[in-house]
């Protein structure tokens, strides 16, 4: 196969792979585990890594980083001209920085997502989920179709993250609208407009905390205190809040949606979970492995020529570790295409690996376990209202999920 033919054949961004990219990733692991693809719109070279060891190694390699300014200007220039989406406005945060700045910021923020804080939020998550399920039950009793995404997966993380940062609950509709705009209009005017409004909102809330430092004991108040003491800059503060709200929201929404979908697509595993509710934790982990909400890690840059297997990735080109592909590598996972909620061990990379392991993983897990487990318990006779093949998936391989998940719940 010629290089150009292979590029056409192995293009994970092609529309036909959106709903189910796994057959393509199986072929790539076997035939082109380190695959160079030139973006059709941007002309930039992306290197897709699909084998578990290569993905894991790339996420640990100090010669592969996230900060574009660590490259010479001539190598960085082709990438900068495409950084026009809303996320480009706010890159001074743990998601986009390398050590030592990454280490400093993560040390400030990580305690808010640690085991103690997450445990203290668990009862609140249960309360919110209970209220959302009550609303779903009322709609079902009236004969209406219910949508897991719209009525459970979307509102839950918005409410939880707003409470964590001390944002007014009544502003949740604004967060939702901004998030939808940023996802719908990537690299466009809508994305920039929504991102700017979100940034302005965060800046206003920071100013309010400075004016009334005694007002709250939430995460934003604690970070504002760090800004006052010089531990974090204003740009880093705004950027960190922006990314935590946006990334935490979308990842959790999609994890809940995909988790429910996979259980309904695998009735034997759903029955197993109903018989043994304590398997809800492993069920969430298996969702992260089998069909996780994050397709690939955030783009990395080769800071020097990087050898991966027999290939050499030139300095300045983009490295994309494909988490979905690594998580079905048969060299690591027996029967990788089987959805098994009792899988043990399960060393998936669904939340990443190394210094950029997902900061909010513990909180996302609590929300997913509570939402999915409570839904299964509350509505034992629920079923999909449409054929799974008719579900619409988001078009982005990075943050992926179904747009709607309609259920039938017998009255």
Q: How should each PLM-predicted stretch be described?
A:
Residues 1-411:
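Cytochrome P450
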């Amino acid at each position: 196969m010629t290089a150009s033919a292979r590029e056409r054949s192995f293009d994970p961004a092609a529309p036909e792979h959106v709903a189910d990219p796994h057959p393509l990733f199986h072929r790539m692991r076997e035939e082109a585990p380190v695959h160079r693809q030139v973006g059709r719109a941007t002309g930039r070279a992306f290197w897709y890594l699909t084998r578990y060891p290569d993905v894991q190694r790339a996420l640990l390699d100090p010669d592969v980083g996230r900060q574009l300014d660590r490259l010479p200007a001539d190598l960085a220039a082709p990438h900068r001209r495409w950084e026009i989406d809303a996320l480009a406005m706010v890159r001074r945060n743990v998601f986009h920085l390398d050590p030592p700045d990454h280490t400093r910021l993560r040390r400030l923020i990580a305690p808010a997502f640690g085991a103690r804080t997450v445990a203290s939020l668990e009862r609140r998550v249960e309360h919110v989920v209970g209220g959302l399920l009550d609303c779903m039950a009322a709609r079902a009793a009236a004969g209406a179709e219910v949508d897991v995404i719209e009525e459970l997966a979307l509102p839950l993380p918005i409410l939880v993250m707003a409470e964590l940062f001390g944002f007014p609950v009544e502003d949740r509709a604004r967060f939702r609208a901004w998030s939808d705009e940023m996802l719908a209009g990537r690299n466009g005017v809508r994305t920039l407009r929504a991102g700017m409004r979100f940034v302005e909102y965060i800046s206003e809330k920071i100013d309010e905390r400075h004016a009334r430092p005694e007002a709250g004991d939430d995460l934003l108040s604690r970070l504002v205190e760090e800004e006052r003491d010089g531990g974090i800059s204003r740009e880093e503060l705004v950027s960190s809040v922006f990314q935590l709200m946006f990334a935490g929201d979308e990842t959790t929404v999609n994890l809940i949606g995909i988790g429910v979908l996979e259980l309904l697509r695998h009735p034997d595993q759903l029955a197993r979970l109903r018989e043994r509710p304590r398997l809800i934790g492993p069920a969430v982990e298996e969702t992260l492995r089998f069909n996780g909400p994050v397709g690939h890690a955030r783009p990395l840059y080769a800071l020097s020529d990087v050898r991966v297997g027999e290939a050499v990735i030139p300095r300045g080109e983009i490295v994309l570790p494909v988490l979905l592909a690594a998580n079905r590598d048969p060299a690591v996972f027996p029967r990788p295409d089987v959805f098994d909620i009792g899988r043990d061990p399960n060393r998936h990379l669904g939340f990443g690996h190394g210094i950029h392991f997902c900061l909010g993983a513990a909180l996302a897990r609590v929300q997913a376990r509570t939402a999915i487990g409570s839904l299964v318990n509350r509505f034992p006779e629920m079923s999909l209202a449409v054929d799974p093949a008719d579900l619409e998936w988001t078009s982005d391989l990075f943050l992926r999920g179904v747009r709607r998940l309609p259920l039938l719940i017998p009255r």
